């Protein structure tokens, strides 16, 4: 396992978990991926890392299956490949899959994992980037705090960019009822 993967794992949320196995996925024409199978008590997760230590995804391993079939290379259309090369120069393609009629492409760009989604006719729909709360603009945080979800705990934050707008999707959970919601706020602080 490369030092960058080990360092990223040891600095991440799963550092205290036991590493049960490490798989190296070599795929023609796509990024090499390392899969760390980690466990704690009855929970198991597969953590997918790029060679340079970017955490690509965290997947609960409910069946103990380690075939990683969802990481098999998918052929991308020229339109999608050209768009990615133009909008994200130097991006490395990690994975691509068809889901609900859309094509979702996972890339690494500027040291971050991004998911780029294309719809009918390979039109770009949006790009999603996971971000830390500290990276969210103050105006967006203030909007969340003044909303009905202001006292709820924050589970996850994603930044979305589409052809016509940029917004944050903030997953929150009520500490009393454990109800969950996703709050969408434009980059200027407008609640959607």
PLM region spans:
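Interaction-mediating elements
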Residues: 1-60, 64-192
């Amino acid at each position: 396992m490369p030092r960058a993967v080990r360092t990223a794992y040891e600095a991440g949320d799963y550092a205290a978990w036991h590493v049960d196995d490490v798989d190296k996925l070599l795929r023609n024409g796509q990024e090499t991926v390392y899969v760390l199978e980690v466990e704690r008590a009855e929970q198991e997760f597969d953590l997918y890392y790029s060679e340079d230590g970017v955490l690509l995804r965290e997947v609960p391993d409910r069946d103990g299956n380690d075939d990683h079939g969802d990481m098999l290379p998918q052929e991308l259309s020229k339109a999608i490949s050209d768009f990615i090369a133009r909008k994200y120069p130097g991006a490395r393609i990690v994975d691509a899959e068809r889901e609900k009629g859309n094509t979702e492409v996972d890339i690494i760009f500027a040291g971050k994992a991004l998911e780029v989604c294309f719809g009918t006719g390979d039109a770009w729909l949006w790009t999603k980037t996971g971000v830390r709360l500290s990276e969210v603009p103050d105006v967006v945080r203030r909007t969340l705090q003044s909303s009905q979800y202001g006292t709820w705990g924050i589970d996850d934050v994603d930044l979305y960019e589409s052809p016509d707008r940029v917004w944050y999707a903030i997953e929150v959970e009520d500490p009393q009822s454990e109800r969950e919601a996703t709050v969408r706020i434009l980059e200027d602080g407008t609640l959607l």
